[in-house]
Every structure is written in structure tokens, then in C-alpha cells.
Amino acid sequence: MRLTERDLELLRWINGHGFVTARQAANWMGTCLQTGHRRMGLLHQGGYLKRQRLFHGAERAYWLSALGQQVSGDTLSCPETISPATYRHHWMMVDLAHDLITKTKGQFTPERRLREQRAIKGVGAEGHVPDGLLEVKSKKPIAIELELTLKGRERLEGIVEGYLDRDLSAVWYFVTSDRIQRRLNSIIDGERLFKIKPWQPRS
């Protein structure tokens, strides 16, 4: 299989998120679902991608193999496996990132890339890393958080307090339930840096 520059970009995009589905790859490529499945299948057959269906009825996950990382020139290590515990949050983040890019025409950096950048700068493991950063034109970055479960109050308070010291234009919390929204509202208490946005994933 002869890889194009677009294929290499696709591999690096996949690795930034950890894994994606064929549907999500089709969205990124701006093609139909059939084309997305075909391209991902060819990359898998060529040994550049691994794939697995983690749950019955779920979309199949694709992620980079060692060969895929090598040919793409990506410095970010590819996952060995996909964790069932984080599968739902990860694939929803890919959809959310696509929605944000489509609506704002901005650039999105996923958590894995942010952690890599932090390691390169030698910052270590201090401080909370958001689920992503959205950059829109000349504005300061917007931290993106996707909350699917109700975190403990003390933990959320620590994360919110930490954001107040960062050079951000906003922190957007996307929530999937009223209960999570109420918890966050009680902690944020009107602080203008934060916005809470109800969001529902694709079925």
C-alpha cells in the first residue's frame, strides 16, 4: 500500500486521540462512511492500524500500530491496547472535538498531545490536564472538559481552582446530565471564566 501525505496526517490525527472509529475518520476526511470504512480497512490490512470491537454493538476502535507510528513520524507513543474503562469517554471526546472544530473553525489539541507537550517542556505531572484545548483565531485557548460521571466535590473544587491561575480565555464544561450540571454550578458559583454546556453524544 502506498501511503499519501493525507494518510500520514490521518495516522497522526488518530494517534493524537488515542483511537477513533471509521465514522469519526470519515468525518475528519470529509467523506462518506463507506469511504471511511474502506480507508481504515486498507490501513489496517497494511499493518498501520490495529482494531478491536470492545463491546457488542459498539463501533470498532482503530489505533496506531508500531509501524503506523514509525511511518507517520509521530513522536507520541501509540497505545498498546484500548481500555474498556475509558472507551466511552475517549470516543465521545473525538465527536465533541469534531463538533467544536465545525462550529468555531478553530484548532483542537487533545489531551494526549497536551500531555506530550508537557513532558517535552519538563513540567512533569503537576496540575490538571484538560480533555483538550480549543484555539480560535487570536483568542487565548479555551480549556475543554467532558464530564460523563459525577466526580467528588473536593476533586472538582481543586480542578476549578487550578484553572483560575491559568492563561485561558474560558473553560467550557460539557455535561451529559442535569445532576452533573448542578454539581458544577454549585462549585463554579458564577465565576465568569467557566461555561457549562449540556451536550449529548451521537447514539
Give the label of every model feature segment.
Residues S77-M93:
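A short, highly charged nucleic-acid-interacting micro-segment common to nuclease
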Residues P141, L148-R192:
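Catalytic cores of nucleic-acid endonucleases
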Residues M1-E80:
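Nuclease-adjacent, charged terminal/linker segments that flank catalytic cores
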Residues M40, H44, L96-T104, Y163, ...:
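Hydrophobic, Leu/Ile/Phe/Ala-enriched alpha-helical segments that form helix-helix packing faces
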Residues G36, H128, R155-L156:
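Amphipathic coiled-coil/heptad-repeat helices and related helical stalk/stem segments
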Residues Q52-R53, P84-R88, A97, I101-A143, ...:
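Active-site metal-binding core of divalent-cation-utilizing nuclease and nuclease-like domains
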Residues E191-S203:
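Charged, structured surface patches that assemble and position nucleic-acid processing machinery
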